[in-house]
């Protein structure tokens, strides 16, 4: 396989993705590029747009990731706009708006988009959980401190390394790795 670039301006996201893909025999190079994102509630639409922009910049096989929180009680928002809400509200404001002093059911969704010049492929992963009433153990992955996956008493940020094993991102990356093996993009 030619070099696969992961286009993101987030070094923590790159590190996590590289760690998850390594056991699959997939090595990714970091392309530290901030892509202008379209504003949409649709995570798939944002990921598809980002990967096409990334491919036009790199002219090589590229992958991007976009994730968000889907809250059915709020009409599927913030969805693809989670980062916009997060930037405007911060951790406390996010909890105040979306949990309103009670935990609110949520789905964390990640979409990996891949483009190799011939086509765009999307790979999805999701995790059910809830938005907690107060941020816990704020770390580098913004809303990880407010999302508590089902079957756990801790938020993603409190789970530390366990998060990498159960996250929506891992699920999407596992699908992506299987695709690359099946399509003979890598040798296993």
Predicted regions and their residues:
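Anionic-ligand binding patches
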Residues: 2-5, 12-188
């Amino acid at each position: 396989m030619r070099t696969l670039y992961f286009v993101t301006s987030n070094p923590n996201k790159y590190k996590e993705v590289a760690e998850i893909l390594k056991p699959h025999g997939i090595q990714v190079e970091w392309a530290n590029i901030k892509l202008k994102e379209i504003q949409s509630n649709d995570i798939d639409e944002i990921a598809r747009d980002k990967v096409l922009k990334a491919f036009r910049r790199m002219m090589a096989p590229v992958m991007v990731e976009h994730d968000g929180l889907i809250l059915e009680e709020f009409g599927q928002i913030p969805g693809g706009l989670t980062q916009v809400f997060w930037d405007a509200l911060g951790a406390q404001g996010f909890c105040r708006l979306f949990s309103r002093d009670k935990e609110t059911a949520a789905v964390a969704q990640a979409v990996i988009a891949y483009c190799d010049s011939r086509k765009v492929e999307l790979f999805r992963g999701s995790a059910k959980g809830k938005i907690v009433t107060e941020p816990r153990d704020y770390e580098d992955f913004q809303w990880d401190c407010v999302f508590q996956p089902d079957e756990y008493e801790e938020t993603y940020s409190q789970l530390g390394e366990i998060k990498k094993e159960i996250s929506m991102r891992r699920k999407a990356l596992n699908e992506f790795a299987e695709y690359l093996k099946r399509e003979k993009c890598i040798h296993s």
